[in-house]
Amino acid sequence: MTTAATPRLRIGVMGGTFDPIHNGHLVAASEVQQHLQLDEVIFVPTGQPWQKQTVTDGEHRYLMTVIATAANPRFTVSRVDIDRAGTTYTIDTLRDIRRTHPDAELFFITGADAIQQILGWKDVAELWDLAHFVAVTRPGHDLTESGLPHADVRLLEVPALAISSTDCRARVGRGFPVWYLVPDGVVQYISKHHLYRSPL
């Protein structure tokens, strides 16, 4: 008697600086999870991103991400990039996730703007072997399938939320509130730890 093969886990990997994580990140991850029927979405805060000079301490960004994702049972947070020394590259993130989930089908979730720059990323040829790529777009974005850098990239339109981490940091620095832009627990964490120069 033969037994049916266990289906492969379908895991989304959402890397980002998350400085701070905001509701736009969460909505995008939730939409991708639902649309692609992912078993899990792993949020991976970057350690030292190669394209940014200054970021908030990794432990703060990791803890804010844990707080933000805690209510969704399909969301988890990984420390692989935070705990790895040196500059963070997507290829290293995916290699580490592949080592811990050798049989899973991985889907790397990123923005449409980033996907158009992917050919300049480190070890780009291996990226396609490690994961499928999902480019999240907003209504009105003009990226089309013909503009994608590789056949294994799928476009997924998500609701438009005009929120950016840069704007959230600037608002806090000017003493403006970020309620409803970032999750409540993250607002409180930012205030408690006096992040972004000014308490809320």
UniProtKB/Swiss-Prot annotation:
Pathway in which this enzyme or protein is active: Cofactor biosynthesis; NAD(+) biosynthesis; deamido-NAD(+) from nicotinate D-ribonucleotide: step 1/1
EC id: 2.7.7.18
Any Pfam family: CTP_transf_like
UniProt keyword NAD present: yes
InterPro entries, sorted: Cyt_trans-like, NadD/NMNAT, Rossmann-like_a/b/a_fold
Sorted UniProt keywords: ATP-binding, NAD, Nucleotide-binding, Nucleotidyltransferase, Pyridine nucleotide biosynthesis, Transferase
GO BP annotations, alphabetical order: NAD biosynthetic process
Single GO molecular function: nicotinate-nucleotide adenylyltransferase activity
Catalysis performed (reactions): nicotinate beta-D-ribonucleotide + ATP + H(+) = deamido-NAD(+) + diphosphate
Family from the record: Belongs to the NadD family.
Function, as annotated: Catalyzes the reversible adenylation of nicotinate mononucleotide (NaMN) to nicotinic acid adenine dinucleotide (NaAD).
Entries under PANTHER family matching the protein: NICOTINATE-NUCLEOTIDE ADENYLYLTRANSFERASE-RELATED, PHOSPHOPANTETHEINE ADENYLYLTRANSFERASE
Name this polypeptide is given: Probable nicotinate-nucleotide adenylyltransferase
Organism from which the protein derives: Clavibacter sepedonicus (Clavibacter michiganensis subsp. sepedonicus)
UniProt gene name: nadD
